[in-house]
Amino acid sequence: NLDIHTHLGAGAYICGEESALLNSLEGGRGEPRMKPPFPAVEGLYAKPTVINNVETLCVVPYIVNEGAEKYAALGTEKSKGTKLVSVSGHVKKPGNYEVVLGTPTREIIYDLAGGIRDGNKLKAFIPGGSSTPMLPADKVDVGYDYEAIAEAGSMLGSGALIVIDDSVNIVETTLRLISFYMHESCGKCTPCREGTRWLYQIVERIMQNKGQLEYIDKLEDICGNMAMKTFCPLADACVSPVVSSIKHFRSDYEEYFKKIPVSSV
């Protein structure tokens, strides 16, 4: 027997980070802690604390009732079991789907989610939520599991599969993602607090046809000074769409520079 208490959070994205979540539960400001000590050693109210996502807890009854071997028989050799995939974006049937790990991403997009809407074609997809690198359409046959997605250059993340069709300019998509992380930054770490704003301002100028070609290099330089330099991965999350969009869709950026009058450069 055990007691379950639920607490309604204020909706801050940063509180998805485990130590920021602990601060919030204690009534403090939602911002990450220095680690170590890790929560399993010193967590909620300085007590050892185990933190799990709801999806992890949901598979426990199946494993207890059916056995670990039956659960491990699902999926790939290294990625066992199933994954809840939240498909959004330019698909005919957005929604939540449970798939066996290793299912081809193409099958999720075209069979389960009904394919690309409005007769358009797939341009890109973000496999595991906005914090994971976007991939071009030619990677759509990759298996939806941790190892295969990593080999393709991204991460499975939260399983939030975002589908982008060919009506979209990737620079605009990138700006929207940067805007989200700029808003959700708790401001504790300088690289994140300042870096997200710099990225937003530069990409915005590019979209306003006020940028210069070297702005692309400047974006990559700023990203290099943000990644792995903060208390939590929010800065890395903001860097992800910028770096991956430049890598796979540099031409979308360069298209804006063709519109700039020579006298304005």
Show the residue positions of the predicted features.
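Terminal amphipathic helices with adjacent charged low-complexity linkers/tails
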Residues: 4, 117-151, 247
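Active-site loop ensemble at the mouth of alpha/beta enzyme cores that anchors a bound cofactor
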Residues: 24-36, 138-155
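Hydrophobic alpha-helical positions that pack around
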Residues: 1-101, 113
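Short glycine/threonine-rich loop-to-helix capping motif typified by GTGT followed
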Residues: 17-20, 100, 131-142, 203, ...
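Extended, hydrophobic alpha-helical segments in both membrane/secreted and soluble proteins
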Residues: 105-108, 121, 185, 199
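Short amphipathic, charge-patterned alpha-helical segments
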Residues: 101-117
